[in-house]
Amino acid sequence: MLQVVISPAKQMRAAQDAFEVLGIPPFARETARLHRALLDIERNEGSDSLQALWNVSDKLLGPCLNTLHEFGPILKNGDLDNPALACHLSPAVMSYHGIQYQSMAPEVMDSAQLAWLQSHLWILSGLYGCVRPFHAVEPYRLEMGAKLAVDDAPDLYAFWSDKLARAIAPAGSNTTIVNLASVEYAKAVLPHLAGDATVVTCLFGEGIRNGKPIQRSTASKKARGSMVRWMAENKLEDVSGLTAFDVGYRHFPELSNNNTLVFLNEQTL
């Protein structure tokens, strides 16, 4: 079984009604608990503590607080029919609006490509844990690396523990994970995988320095989105097919191994 993991985006859009949601994320109660924890911080410590947790400017603090207050946890599929909640909901893959998602361009995919996304792609999230592309989400602000202590968990990595790994690659499923997530998000999953799971991490370089690919954040985000789109277009089911990826990059076998595939910007080759 092939599964792909990617990071979310900080930038999110309000409800996109051109596409219907398909159910709710798998960890609805955990999401509600985290939302309560954020509200508790505001009530007990003030908005300055939230500003530090979110690492946002004075200008962004107000909009982030509004998003927090407007957020309404959904606990069951029946909540999707609640008009007060539905106006804030949209499919996750349409809600995130960063460079990676713009490069992926799911809004212009055909139905077969979108179906591939829904069955193969997981979007990792500090608040939701992990979501399928068409699971219903609301705008929020909470990065996986945020130092949010909840109950006995000192941070979100401890809070989520092995839950995400078990959802994405259940023990005995012999899942191969294509890791397109940032280090911040990947470490919420990869250390907890069962022994039968395998991981292939894709790196995108703009050149080579000291025998290693030169990675640049913006270019890598764009390349990750292009790769997800390419996989959906080709309905990829076998990780060996990844080396054929050729959207602006070419596989560079000299720097690759069984667990890491390196792709270099074709303009540098």
Question: At which residue positions do the language-model features occur?
Answer:
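Short, low-complexity, intrinsically disordered N-terminal peptides in bacterial proteins
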Residues: 1-2, 269
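Internal, well-folded beta-alpha domain core
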Residues: 104-269
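Active-site helix-to-loop segments that bind/position phosphate- or nucleotide-bearing substrates
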Residues: 2-108
